[in-house]
Amino acid sequence: MTIAAAPPSSRFRGVRIWLTLVAALIAVMVLVGGATRLTESGLSIVEWKPVTGSLPPLTETQWHTAFDGYKQIPQYRELNAGMTLDQFKTIFWWEWSHRLLGRVIGIVYLLPFLWFLWRGAIGPEWKRALWIIFALGALQGAVGWWMVASGLSQRTEVSQVRLATHLSLALIIYAAIVWTLRRMADRARVAAPARLKVTALALLGLTFVQLYAGALVAGLRAGRLYNTWPMIDGALIPDAARLWFESPWWKNLFDNHLTVQFDHRMLAYALWTLAALHMIDALRTRAGAAARGAVLLFLALTVQAALGIFTVLYAAPIDLALAHQAMALVVLTLAVLQAERLTATREDRTALGRGAAGRLAVPSELFPSA
C-alpha cells in the first residue's frame, strides 16, 4: 500500500522504530562490553570466526579445546594459571555474549534496511547516511578483533589505545543513529543565539574527547590507582616530572597511568564548566526547548561527575564502573540531541526526507500512527 501524503511526523515512523531498536541494542552492547572488560573476560576467545563462531562449545571436548586455546596466551600463563574449566566458562560466556550481540546488531540493522530500501521508504539523502553507518558497523567488527589480537601474543591485556578506539567507534555509530533519529522527527526550528549553537557543538566534541580519555583510563585500569579526590598523587596538580617522565612526551598521554587519569579529571572539570555556562546562557535567552535540553545535559553531567568521583574513591568496583559507563551514554545522548536541536533548520529535515515523501511504500497497518 502506498501512502500518497504521509504527515511529516509519521513519514518515517517505521524507520525510526527500527533505528531506535538498533540504538538501544548498541547501548546494551556497550554495557556488555564494559562488563566483559571489568571481569577480564575479553581474551577468553582467542580466534575470530565471524560466522561459525556464533555457536559456543556444545560438548565437553569442544570446551576443553577452547580452554586449551586460552591456555596458550600470556594472560592465562601469567595471571590465571590453575584456572578451572568452570572458571573459564564464566569468562567465556561474557566474551561470547558480547560477540553474539554484535552479530545480532548487524542482522537487526541490515535486514530491515534492505527491506526499507526495496519498498522505497528511504530517500537518497538517508540512503547515503545509513549506508555509511552500516559500513562503520562492519568496520567495528574488524576493530574489535584488532583490539583482541593485541592481547594474544605478548601482553596480558588488550592495548588501551585499541580499546579506546573500539569504544569510540561504537559511540560514534550510536551518536550517528541518535542524530539521524532526531533529524527524522521533523520538529520546528529552535530560535536561539548563534553562540548557543557554538557551545552545543563544543560540548559534543568535548564529550567525545572525554569518552576517549575515559576509555584509556579503563584500558590501563588507572581507576584503581590514585584513589583520592580532589587530590591526585598528593596534589591538585601532580609534579610535572611524574606527569611527563616518559619519552617522547606524548606517550604519557596514552601510557602513563597518572597522566591519563589526571587528563580525564581535567576534561571532566572543563566539560562540566562549559555545560554550566551553556545552560546559564540558554536560560537567560529563554531558548525554549534548547534551555530544557541544556538543563538536562548539565544535570546528567553533574550525576556523571559524582559517579566518577565515587568510582575513583572506591577503586573502580564493577557496579560503580558500569554505572559510570551507562551514565556516559546518557550524557552523550543528551549532547547529541542538544547539538542537533540547535544546528538543524526545519528546511534541513524536510529536504533530507524529500526523496521518500509521497511514495513511502510502508503498509500503514504495519506502523499505524500514534
From Swiss-Prot:
GO terms for cellular component: plasma membrane. Its EC number is 1.17.99.9. GO terms for biological process: heme A biosynthetic process. The keyword Aminoacyl-tRNA synthetase does not apply. It catalyses: Fe(II)-heme o + 2 A + H2O = Fe(II)-heme a + 2 AH2. The chain crosses the membrane at residues 15-35, 104-124, 129-149, 161-181, 200-220, 261-280, 293-313, 317-337. It is a multi-pass membrane protein. GO terms for molecular function: metal ion binding; oxidoreductase activity, acting on NAD(P)H, heme protein as acceptor. Keywords: Cell membrane, Heme biosynthesis, Iron, Membrane, Metal-binding, Oxidoreductase, Transmembrane, Transmembrane helix. Pathway: Porphyrin-containing compound metabolism; heme A biosynthesis; heme A from heme O: step 1/1. InterPro entries: COX15/CtaA_fam, HemeA_Synthase_type2. Heme binds at residues 264, 324. HAMAP family: HemeA_synth_type2. Interacts with CtaB. This is Heme A synthase. It comes from Rhodopseudomonas palustris (strain TIE-1).
